[in-house]
Amino acid sequence: MLQVCYNTWKSAKKIHFCAKKREDLIMCGIVGYIGESQAAPILLDGLSKLEYRGYDSAGIAVYNGTEIEVVKSKGRLKVLSEMTHDGSMMPGTLGIGHTRWATHGEPSDINAHPHFNKDESIVVVHNGIIENYLKLKKKLEAKGYQFISDTDTEVIAHLLDYYYTGNPLQAVTKIMHRMEGSYALGIIFRDHPDELYAVRKDSPLIVGHTEGGNIIASDVPAVLKYTRDVFFIENEEIVRMTKDSMEFFTVDEEPLEKESTHIDWDVNAAEKGGYEHFMLKEMYEQPKAITDTFSPRVKEGKIVIDELGMTDEEIRGIKKIMIVACGSAYHTGVTSKYIFEGLARIPVEVDLASEFRYRDPIIEEGTMVIVISQSGETADSLAALREAKKRGARVLGIVNVVGSSIAREADNVMYTWAGPEIAVATTKAYSAQLVAHYLLAMKFAHVRGKLGDTELAAMLEDLRRLPEQVEMLLNNKQKIQKFANRYLAARDIFFIGRGIDYAISLEGSLKLKEISYIHSEAYAAGELKHGTISLIEEGTLVSAVLTQPELYKKMISNMVEVKTRGAFVMAVTNTGNTEVEKAADYVIYIPKTNKYFTNSLAIIPLQLFGYYVSIGRGCDVDKPRNLAKSVTVE
């Protein structure tokens, strides 16, 4: 029997719990290790690199030579570290660890991972959702299995027990045939103490060789300290590892040959590097992310995107572009629509990935679909990609993580070389995605004869100046911090813009609300009179973005409308547009650049504003409540 202990280390027993409340959510992180080193410190270190994914509880399991010892803790990893003295009190060189976002069963001591079978001889950690778990649970209960948690993961442990007859691989393949949904699994069998199993279906998982062992993880940052060469596990694949070997199998137990992928990310890029928060550090890394994304693709005054895999004739044959994404990536897609249509004269549709796959989209010959995702694992975007391919579209993925699912499944992939992004609220990956869109639109426009050599050269020169201009805006942070401190108690903040400026407003609003928890919405300024203006009252902050000269007069008119009704107006506009000062109470000027590139500059003060409002309110900037970095379930 298990003894449950609260906030106390009982060396003779194996289960330990602590408490903290959190909302139901969707994201998890897995780390597993087998080798010559002590497992627990490696598990804790790896899980700490996955904290950005969000979690409400954490746990590790280690085989200590005679039994599998499990330690679970609600709340932050530091509680788990304190309970185990940074893992030193858990001997053993085989283990699995987990950070959990609740999906089935509330965040609680019992529901935290790892989970085990009735005699604690099989231990499992799981990312994803088992859609038929209630049906499986009912059948297992009918056979005498008892459940102590409300999770779908415990069903996996008991199902393994039901099928296990001494052959772990056989048991794993049998449960895979029974389970419906998405999952990444790490599994330990007590009577096979020299083996660690990893399984994947629709939830990301990587494995890699370390010095003296092997490691599994949900994402690259967890393994950078130990290896740069990883294997990306594909759907319905199984990995059997010992400390010296790694074997890959299909769901039908057929052996597989796989090639590793080398990861060039700097290990220090996954650390704070002296900054107070990852988000602040990553904001300051935006100049480098912009440079690293465009520099390799501009050669001798020409845009060269070899990974696009398209001839000039094929580019000229594109009749429509559909852009599919979620969150901030969707906002870069909205920006891209204005640029592609303005420069290349190609009609563009922009869809939320969660809507695209269910609306029966019309994809005709000559349609190109662009799927955007920082992680390359976003579930809705991945499903949309598969739907587009099924309908015959050519699919280009724009992703940041090398070897990710979208990168592997798209016809072609264009990487944004932003490096690992840890903060949940994206900054540098967003900026790199914008640059990828700029390059694509300019390339298409030039090939299709809509952009001449002289115009292209001028735009490339403006693009080269962007990193320096971004850095200049970042160095103006004190002014923005002082202004942000005036709005720490704001109830509502609204963002307005027209054209590309509306796309900027969408992202500025999202940045603010996701990390400060202040209600915020972005509106196309022309829609104010159709209902939104009724929300404006005395003292309401309205952020107006106006970077498009042809829309200055219209925007200033909108600013006067809200100001007349008591709003305090903050404006973000181009240097030299002093007319705006007649309608704004506070103005932030950005350097002059090509009108299609203004998003890259106007977003910087809005990122800083959101950051400093959040800091002033005492919010967790890097890990805001109820959010995950990469949403890998629907």
Spans of model-derived segments:
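Active-site phosphate/pyrophosphate-binding segments
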Residues: 286-290, 294-322, 412-541, 614-634
